[in-house]
């Protein structure tokens, strides 16, 4: 994608930095993950967790959620103004799992948010370190993307459940900033905009007055974020129409759904970052590694290397398959929920199976689940190769569309074709090409029709040996061209419920 001079790399978005050179970026991202690690170590001390308990991913998630909740200004303000029964607005907590006499026990802890904020700032040189918080949000979002389906949310906004590959980042909180916006899929942005437009249709005052002015600014900003994800002129022109609409209504919703469908073939640019659980950074910091001095990148070899050398455990329910649990977390760590399974399998070095075939539920354990029968096992998060994460949709040629398959948004910059069922996608585009966006619609449909499923994306890009940290010898895998690799195929996962 032709990058404008003003574009910042994701690492800059991630660290809130202005333009920096590669070394500065690596140092500031290193500082960010180092701060997360220091915070985690301190929390383990506070909670008196053993080494094993500190490596338990469920404990990591509870600690991450506590710090996110402690810094959630808007919600904290809301909780103070609307006191609800049994919720202390000044406290945060969750389940911590400890091993007693060979059995796992659940212990509910409560902390002052103020205290958590103090520990976090102390670990981050006295600063709020919002970038680190966003990083944790993206890790949780990637975990949700790999674990749950969003069929219901898609249907509610009038979209087709088969468009799930466009839903990356759909559970990210609004406050996740530029780094969060970069990882949101086209479908996620479309859904946020449709919800906004629907509120405007139902509530006469939504766009009016001082509040309405702020709403309008937010609407236009979201439109611009979505526009920036599209790579063809016609899609961008349609976004301009949606943004400039005087009074957004059903016509805009139609246009947005049309654009979302078109993104199945004319894919948008969506960033991918390997965000790891806090306990992984904690382990590495505890071993004496200096992230800031060594530098770190979310899109290169570094996360692979960390996972190669860290042992993380997970609680396992009686009928779950530990290998499947590992696959789920591996995909979340690399933000690969929407990647082609052929590519993921090749990089991981073991077969990555569609979600419908996984014998595992989510990573988090509900408060009513029986701990008596819980076991724990090591998560296998290592890989055979590493590959560079991409922020492009893998379209073969800037203006011409490439093939896309219902359910792929590439994560790794690795050569492959993106098989798709053209008939299925094109069937959605019959009829309506009239109205003010008719010429753009016609142009978009023309580009989609010329797309070929056998076209190769990421020409010449390959994976690398884990010893090849400078990425000098790409190994270009050859894939069975017909075999399609959708993770969500034949899906039976549970829905994401807040």
Curated annotation (Swiss-Prot):
It comes from the Viruses. Keywords: Capsid protein, Helical capsid protein, Host nucleus, Host-virus interaction, Ribonucleoprotein, RNA-binding, Viral nucleoprotein, Viral penetration into host nucleus, Virion, Virus entry into host cell. A motif (Bipartite nuclear localization signal) lies at residues 198-216. Homomultimerizes to form the nucleocapsid. May bind host exportin-1/XPO1. Binds to viral genomic RNA. Protein-RNA contacts are mediated by a combination of electrostatic interactions between positively charged residues and the phosphate backbone and planar interactions between aromatic side chains and bases. This is Nucleoprotein. Late in virus-infected cells, may be cleaved from a 56-kDa protein to a 53-kDa protein by a cellular caspase. This cleavage might be a marker for the onset of apoptosis in infected cells or have a specific function in virus host interaction. Residues 1-21 are annotated as: Disordered. It is found in: Virion; Host nucleus. Encapsidates the negative strand viral RNA, protecting it from nucleases. The encapsidated genomic RNA is termed the ribonucleoprotein (RNP) and serves as template for transcription and replication. The RNP needs to be localized in the host nucleus to start an infectious cycle, but is too large to diffuse through the nuclear pore complex. NP comprises at least 2 nuclear localization signals that are responsible for the active RNP import into the nucleus through cellular importin alpha/beta pathway. A motif (Unconventional nuclear localization signal) lies at residues 1-18. One of its GO terms (molecular function) is structural molecule activity. Belongs to the influenza viruses nucleoprotein family. Transmembrane segments: none annotated. One of its GO terms (biological process) is symbiont entry into host cell. InterPro entries: Flu_NP (IPR002141). GO terms for cellular component: helical viral capsid; host cell; host cell nucleus; ribonucleoprotein complex; viral nucleocapsid.
């Amino acid at each position: 994608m032709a990058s404008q001079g003003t574009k910042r790399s994701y690492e800059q978005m991630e660290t809130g930095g202005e333009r920096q050179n590669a070394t500065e970026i690596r140092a500031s991202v290193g500082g960010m993950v180092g701060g997360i690690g220091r915070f985690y170590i301190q929390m383990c001390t506070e909670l008196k967790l053993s080494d094993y308990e500190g490596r338990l991913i469920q404990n990591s998630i509870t600690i991450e959620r506590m710090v996110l909740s402690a810094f959630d200004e808007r919600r904290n303000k809301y909780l103070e103004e609307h006191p609800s029964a049994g919720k202390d607005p000044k406290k945060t907590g969750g389940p911590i799992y400890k091993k007693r006499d060979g059995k796992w026990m659940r212990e509910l802890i409560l902390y002052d948010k103020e205290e958590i904020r103090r520990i976090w700032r102390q670990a981050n040189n006295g600063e709020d370190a919002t970038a680190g918080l966003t990083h944790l949000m993206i890790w949780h979002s990637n975990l949700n993307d790999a674990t749950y389906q969003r069929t219901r949310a898609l249907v509610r906004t009038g979209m087709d459940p088969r468009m799930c590959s466009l839903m990356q980042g759909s559970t990210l909180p609004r406050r996740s900033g530029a780094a969060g916006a970069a990882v949101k899929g086209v479908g996620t942005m479309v859904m946020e905009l449709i919800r906004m437009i629907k509120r405007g249709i139902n509530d006469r005052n939504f766009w009016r007055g001082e509040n309405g002015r702020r709403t309008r600014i937010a609407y236009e900003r979201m439109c611009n974020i979505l526009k920036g994800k599209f790579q063809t002129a016609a899609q961008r022109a349609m976004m301009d129409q949606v943004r400039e609409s005087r009074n957004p209504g059903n016509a805009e919703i139609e246009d947005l759904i049309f654009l979302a469908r078109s993104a199945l073939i004319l894919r948008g640019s969506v960033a991918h970052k390997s965000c790891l659980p806090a306990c992984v950074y904690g382990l590495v910091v505890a071993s004496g590694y200096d992230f800031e001095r060594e530098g770190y990148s979310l899109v290169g070899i570094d996360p692979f290397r960390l996972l190669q050398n860290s042992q993380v455990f997970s609680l396992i329910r009686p009928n779950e398959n530990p290998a499947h649990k590992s696959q789920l977390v591996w995909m979340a760590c690399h933000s690969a929920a929407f990647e082609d399974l052929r590519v993921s399998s090749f990089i991981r070095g073991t077969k990555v199976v569609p979600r419908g075939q996984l014998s595992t539920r989510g990573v988090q354990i509900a408060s009513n689940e029986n701990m008596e029968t819980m076991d724990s096992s090591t998560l296998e998060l290592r890989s055979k190769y590493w590959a560079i994460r991409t922020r492009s949709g893998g379209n073969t040629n800037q203006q011409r569309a490439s093939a896309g398959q219902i359910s792929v948004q590439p994560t790794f910059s690795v050569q492959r074709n993106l098989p798709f069922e053209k008939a299925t996608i094109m069937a959605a585009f019959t009829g309506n090409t009239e109205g003010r966006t008719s010429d753009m619609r016609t142009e978009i449909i023309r580009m989609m029709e010329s797309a070929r499923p056998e076209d190769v994306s990421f020409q010449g890009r390959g994976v690398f040996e884990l010893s090849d940290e400078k990425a000098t010898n790409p190994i270009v895998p050859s894939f069975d061209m017909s075999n399609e690799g959708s993770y969500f195929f034949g899906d039976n996962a549970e829905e994401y419920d807040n």
